[in-house]
């Protein structure tokens, strides 16, 4: 909690955080947190686990659910299962489908959690990694490395997320600088600045794709978003970036509640708003960049999921962030399942599926913004 100013006594710091939490939840007393969130959280985790098993079992080669469970369990350390599953099924599940499903889940979790973070930091319900240009900026950074022919890894560490992170940070800095009006961030200017930055990044990415025909397929996957080339390597490469970023965000849920107040009020409560914003924006952008570097630009996950969670479980970021993470993973796993089964044997880019779900929802939210009926 070093972001809390040292001039504020520890007792006042705790009281300040409780005050912000109470204002965020709309309750006068917070210690009991109303009803326990654990049953609902465990239910969401159970739905996520069921989605993983379903998506891993369903495909052109249908595999029974019990066989899928046996195959997964047999690869876990310390568990021995009778080898009664055909080798072909084992290869399909472990080498093809499971890496794809887990990468889709990781990407959905990251995008949803980052979307909730951006919405809290900007105090704007339409902030989203895709809408404010962060995802397209990250895609531009990753594309620049791909077409340059530079090494994609250094001592086992993937460099694509770092390049994507540079593009994401530059994009969010430009959007924030252009859209800010005094101490406020109006919805209209935020969306317009995001559209401008996203359009510019997409134009440069398209130009690089046209100039480098040998890397067209790789860049195409980054632009549209797809998991059809997912591997265990891509999944593990993202973890060193995603896990620390997620830990930072989840541990600062209370401070994100404080940021929902006016900046001057936050300072009076002992919080340094600018340092907190920079930390959370950096963590959210790093996580988004890591996801974009392996999955491409997938829109509207960071918009749909946090709002759905907020409607069901309230705006308290201590609940909103972890629930967005779990629900985002479930949403993108099911979206990817639809993308690869709706038009078999062809496959639809998952970004198209999320756009079909997200655009009507975005228009609905935009209308509510005009009516001032958000939080």
Q: Which role fits each region the language model picked out?
A:
Residues 2-375:
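Alpha-helical transmembrane segments in inner-membrane proteins
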């Amino acid at each position: 909690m070093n972001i809390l100013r040292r001039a504020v006594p520890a007792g006042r710091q705790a009281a300040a955080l409780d005050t912000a939490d109470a204002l965020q939840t709309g309750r006068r007393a917070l210690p009991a947190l109303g009803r326990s969130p654990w049953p609902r959280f465990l239910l969401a985790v159970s739905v996520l686990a069921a989605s993983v098993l379903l998506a891993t079992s369903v495909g052109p080669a249908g595999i029974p659910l019990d066989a899928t469970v046996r195959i997964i369990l047999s690869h876990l350390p310390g568990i021995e299962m009778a080898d009664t599953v055909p080798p072909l099924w084992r290869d399909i599940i472990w080498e093809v489908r499971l890496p794809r499903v887990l990468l889709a889940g990781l990407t959905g979790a990251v995008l949803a959690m980052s979307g909730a973070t951006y919405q809290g930091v900007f105090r704007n319900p339409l902030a989203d990694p895709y809408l404010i240009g962060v995802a397209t900026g990250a895609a531009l950074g990753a594309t620049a490395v791909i077409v340059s022919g530079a090494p994609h890894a250094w001592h086992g560490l993937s460099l694509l997320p770092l390049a994507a992170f540079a593009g994401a940070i530059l994009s969010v800095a430009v959007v924030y600088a252009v859209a800010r009006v005094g101490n406020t961030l109006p919805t209209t200017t935020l969306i317009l600045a995001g559209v401008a930055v996203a359009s510019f990044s997409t134009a440069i990415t398209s130009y690089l794709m046209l100039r480098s025909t040998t890397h067209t397929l790789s860049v195409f996957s980054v632009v549209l978003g797809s998991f059809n080339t997912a591997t265990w390597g891509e999944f593990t490469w993202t973890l060193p970036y995603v896990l620390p970023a997620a830990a930072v965000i989840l541990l600062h849920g209370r401070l994100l509640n404080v940021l929902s107040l006016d900046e001057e009020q936050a300072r009076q409560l002992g919080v340094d708003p600018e340092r907190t914003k920079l930390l959370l924006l950096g963590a959210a952008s790093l996580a988004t960049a890591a996801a974009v570097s392996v999955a491409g630009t997938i829109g509207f996950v960071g918009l749909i999921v946090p709002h759905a969670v907020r409607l069901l479980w309230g705006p308290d970021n201590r609940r909103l962030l972890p629930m967005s993470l779990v629900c985002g993973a479930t949403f993108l796993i099911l979206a990817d399942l639809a993308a690869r089964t709706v038009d078999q044997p062809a496959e639809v880019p998952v970004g198209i599926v999320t756009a079909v779900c997200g655009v009507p929802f975005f228009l609905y939210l935009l209308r509510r913004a005009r009516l001032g009926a958000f939080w």
